[in-house]
């Protein structure tokens, strides 16, 4: 696995600076200012209008003005990176707004048109996110439409790619970046759907095969009942976790893992045997990664589940089992704390998980599936590299990318230790492992 990751990094560094010629399009951005619906329509206009008219001077000043330290994005409340299109906003919302305008997309809300838009679930409903962009004052007239840029390039030399910049508006668009961004957007949207499913009552299944062959629940969350014990957890007092809390979250996360896996087209094309092999290899990693990433930050010595239950660095007596080696300290030191130091975004986290999931070395994966899984992993590694570097630039981005990939060894070691603990539980019967978890996580003899 490590060789594959290193090769992919070298490949993306080599291919990074090849610009794609932008198609010439004559558009009037003022057509995009109707805030009553999250839709974009196309009309022909004149590309000869001066840049000062298309991009008023006060907007240019706003774009250059630095945001105060700690300023939040007006759209999703993530940390703002600057004034984009007239509004203090993060790179994610800036890119989303620009892409929506330029690609003429139309979105439909599946609910009542009043979805919550915040940094954790901002990709769940693009209709409401685009409306929020307009509501807070993002100005489509501030976009420099590609046709204007092409006219400018014909007059003067083509601008060089700014390799040190993290802004995709300042870098030339390349084919692999466009493809990577589509991958990132899709994964981030699915991540939001997983968060919705975590708050729902998940139907029971008879086993892993039943779960794999059932329709994907991520697209049916509106039909599921909300689990009231998991709502508004941010306002609840924390309480020490019991073994029942841990058991409940293990089962829930592994059920969500299967629903998450079923959103990948390549995964759906695999036969059932290979599907089983991939999820068995990754299910507990999915559980572990989500546990620490979504744990509210109550310091480096505490993992907090989303229902308010917590585990300390020195686990409380009720979650200690005879003969089992504690793994929570390693989860904190080797995964949770590094994630926080890297300031991992939801998009980066979602793409990292996808790259880990498609493991061509997964036990019992058929030779026929290995090549397809290998290519799929490379696709998500490329998406991860783009996701990181477009935000913070190549030099810093390479370090962050490498730091993430180096964590895979720790993740594998923790998984091996968990497997050992499950074998001890099974041998000494000091805790009954849930049948679904056992089928999904314990390697066959």
UniProtKB/Swiss-Prot annotation:
Keyword field contains Zinc: yes
SUPFAM superfamilies: Glucocorticoid receptor-like (DNA-binding domain), Nuclear receptor ligand-binding domain
Cell compartments where the protein resides: Nucleus
Keywords (A to Z) from UniProt: DNA-binding, Metal-binding, Nucleus, Receptor, Transcription, Transcription regulation, Zinc, Zinc-finger
Domain annotation NR LBD: ranges: 179-444
Annotated Pfam families: Hormone_recep, zf-C4
Span of zinc fingers (NR C4-type): 73-93, 109-133
Family membership: Belongs to the nuclear hormone receptor family.
Compositionally biased region (Polar residues): 36-51
One record GO biological process: cell differentiation
Function statement: Orphan nuclear receptor which acts in concert with the insulin/IGF-1-like signaling (IIS) pathway during osmotic stress, perhaps in response to a ligand modified by the sulfotransferase ssu-1.
Molecular-function GO terms, alphabetical: nuclear receptor activity; RNA polymerase II cis-regulatory region sequence-specific DNA binding; zinc ion binding
The protein's name in its UniProt record: Nuclear hormone receptor family member nhr-1
Region feature (Disordered): 19-55
GO cellular component term, pick one: nucleus
CDD domains: NR_DBD_HNF4A, NR_LBD
InterPro entries from the UniProt entry: HNF4-like_DBD, NHR-like_dom_sf, Nucl_hrmn_rcpt_lig-bd, Nuclear_hormone_rcpt_NR2, Nuclear_hrmn_rcpt, Znf_hrmn_rcpt, Znf_NHR/GATA
């Amino acid at each position: 696995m490590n060789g594959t990751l290193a090769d992919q990094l070298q490949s993306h560094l080599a291919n990074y600076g090849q610009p794609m010629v932008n198609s010439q399009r004559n558009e009037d951005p003022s057509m995009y200012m109707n805030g009553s619906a999250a839709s974009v329509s196309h009309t022909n206009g004149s590309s000869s209008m001066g840049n000062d008219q298309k991009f008023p001077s006060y907007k240019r000043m706003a774009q250059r003005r630095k945001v105060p330290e700690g300023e939040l994005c007006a759209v999703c409340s993530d940390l703002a990176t600057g004034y984009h299109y007239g509004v203090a906003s993060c790179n994610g919302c800036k890119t989303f707004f620009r892409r929506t305008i330029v690609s003429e997309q139309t979105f439909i809300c599946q609910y009542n048109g009043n979805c919550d838009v915040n940094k954790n679930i901002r990709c769940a409903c693009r209709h409401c996110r685009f409306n929020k962009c307009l509501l807070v004052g993002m100005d489509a007239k501030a976009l420099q439409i590609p046709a204007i840029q092409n006219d400018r390039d014909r007059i003067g030399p083509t601008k060089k790619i700014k390799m040190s910049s993290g802004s995709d508006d300042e870098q030339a668009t390349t084919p692999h970046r466009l493809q990577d961004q589509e991958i990132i957007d899709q994964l981030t949207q699915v991540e939001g759907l997983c968060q919705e499913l975590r708050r729902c009552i998940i139907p029971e299944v008879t086993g892993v095969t039943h779960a794999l062959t059932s329709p994907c629940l991520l697209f049916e969350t509106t039909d599921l009942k909300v689990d009231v014990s998991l709502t508004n957890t941010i306002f609840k007092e924390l309480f020490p976790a019991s073994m029942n809390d841990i058991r409940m979250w293990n089962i829930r996360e592994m059920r969500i893992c299967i629903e998450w896996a079923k959103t990948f087209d390549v995964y759906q094309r695999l036969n059932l045997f290979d599907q089983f092999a991939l999820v068995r290899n990754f299910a507990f990693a999915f559980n572990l990664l989500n546990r620490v990433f979504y744990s509210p930050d109550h310091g480096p010595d505490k993992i907090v589940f989303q229902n308010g239950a917590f585990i300390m660095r020195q686990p409380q007596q009720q979650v200690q089992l005879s003969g089992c080696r504690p793994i929570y300290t390693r989860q904190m030191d080797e995964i949770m704390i590094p994630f926080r130091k890297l300031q991992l975004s939801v998009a980066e986290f979602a793409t990292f998980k996808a790259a880990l999931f498609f493991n061509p070395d997964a036990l019992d994966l058929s030779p026929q599936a290995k090549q397809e899984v290998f290519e799929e992993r490379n696709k998500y590694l490329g998406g991860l590299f783009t996701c990181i570097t477009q935000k913070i630039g190549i030099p810093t981005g390479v370090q962050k990318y490498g730091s993430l990939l180096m964590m895979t060894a720790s993740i594998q070691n923790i998984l091996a230790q968990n497997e050992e603990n499950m074998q001890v539980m099974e041998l000494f019967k000091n805790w009954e492992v849930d049948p679904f978890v056992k089928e999904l996580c314990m390697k066959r003899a």
